[in-house]
């Protein structure tokens, strides 16, 4: 790397707490046993208990596979979910699932139809994913288990507001959502969670002309929405325990190796990099759609970790490690190398369909991340 480090600084490059030098976003390709069991459950050929046992067995297997790649962090691959966001959001108080007329439009492909609507007061009383985390925690061993949930902004971005008080008062809606999330974060912490990630595609609306039209349809302005999104997150994570790491993954969409949005971080950079009280940010940087590293100049905090998603999860071909290292060096011109980490740009299966690569290619990608990180931060 271009920056010279002293022995003391070099020692600090070996991070003992998350996010780690080699990290991952979270979702993994659903295995064939899980896919088959889900179909059997839907057809009435399997009980919920039988499905959960198969999920348990497969999660145990993939946790070990993650460890074999050299990662210090493990997830359950989101194996119990169909969607990265809806499964969590529809189990909040005041939220219900529904079937819209069409799915979400991605680049040349559309998801199956699924939506959520806000019909009552938003709150958090309990949630099935608490048990999901407890199982992961029980099998993680020496690795750090990470829980991934959608950002509070996703309820605004993807939720159909049917409660009149919320439709007429976004500030009230934000207040109640953040309050519910604050309870959720504490509930996961009480189950032993010390590494929580918020996944967020809502920030992509600021990054393109298409997104700006969406903001106009919301009846607000970009400045107002940036402030609302930032307050939603900051209020939700305020006063969190000192030993809880909370990061956010900013995504431009990830469905069957396609995307929904493109554009650099410039239009929301000051808010993202200097307005959120998070411990780390997972940033997509796997191709030209994500722009350059110049927006990192807005980073003011020396304790904010930036996890560069320079390895794509959309395709199986491995990146040239020298190219990845060169890009890390480029990023280090704007922030200290000590503040940088490496991961895939997104999960491998944000929905149960998964991206277009094999499971072995997935593990190879994660090994690739670990090997490159070990070379850079050695």
From Swiss-Prot:
GO function term, MF aspect, one: 5-methyltetrahydropteroyltriglutamate-homocysteine S-methyltransferase activity
Record-linked CDD domains: CIMS_C_terminal_like
Transmembrane segment boundaries: none
Gene Ontology biological process terms in this record: methionine biosynthetic process
Pfam families hit by this protein: Meth_synt_2
Region of interest (Disordered), ranges: 1-33
SUPFAM superfamilies, alphabetized: UROD/MetE-like
Ranges of biased composition (kind: Polar residues): 1-11
Family: To B.subtilis YxjH.
Protein name: Uncharacterized protein YxjG
Record lineage: Bacteria, Bacillati, Bacillota, Bacilli, Bacillales
